[in-house]
UniProtKB/Swiss-Prot annotation:
It comes from the Eukaryota. Its main location: nucleus. This is Transcription elongation factor 1 homolog. InterPro entries: Elf1 (IPR007808), T_Elf1_sf (IPR038567). One of its GO terms (molecular function) is RNA polymerase II complex binding. It comes from Manduca sexta. Transcription elongation factor implicated in the maintenance of proper chromatin structure in actively transcribed regions.
Length: 82
């Protein structure tokens, strides 16, 4: 007599990786997606600037830095100033 075939569960579906945002809300004028980050990896610097109120912020970066890190540094600097 032969064995019964075992029913295997299908492999789990992988979740799609969502890319991180490149544009952010301005903490000064509260416009949505008005701040754009420009990163210069050669000089290890980054600048974020609002296209509406023209506020900007410069910071140093490292190899692992992403635009969201620059935005968080800007928000932290705003909170520490107040």
């Amino acid at each position: 007599m032969g064995r019964r075939k075992s029913k295997r569960k299908p492999p789990p579906k992988r979740k799609a990786i969502e890319p991180l945002d490149q544009q952010f809300n301005c903490p000064f004028c509260n416009h949505e997606k008005s701040c754009e980050v420009k990163m210069d990896r050669a000089k290890n610097t980054a600048m974020i600037q609002c296209t509406v109120c023209l506020e900007d912020f410069h910071t140093t970066t490292n190899v692992l830095s992403e635009p969201i890190d620059v935005y968080n540094d800007w928000v932290d600097a705003c909170e520490s100033a107040n």
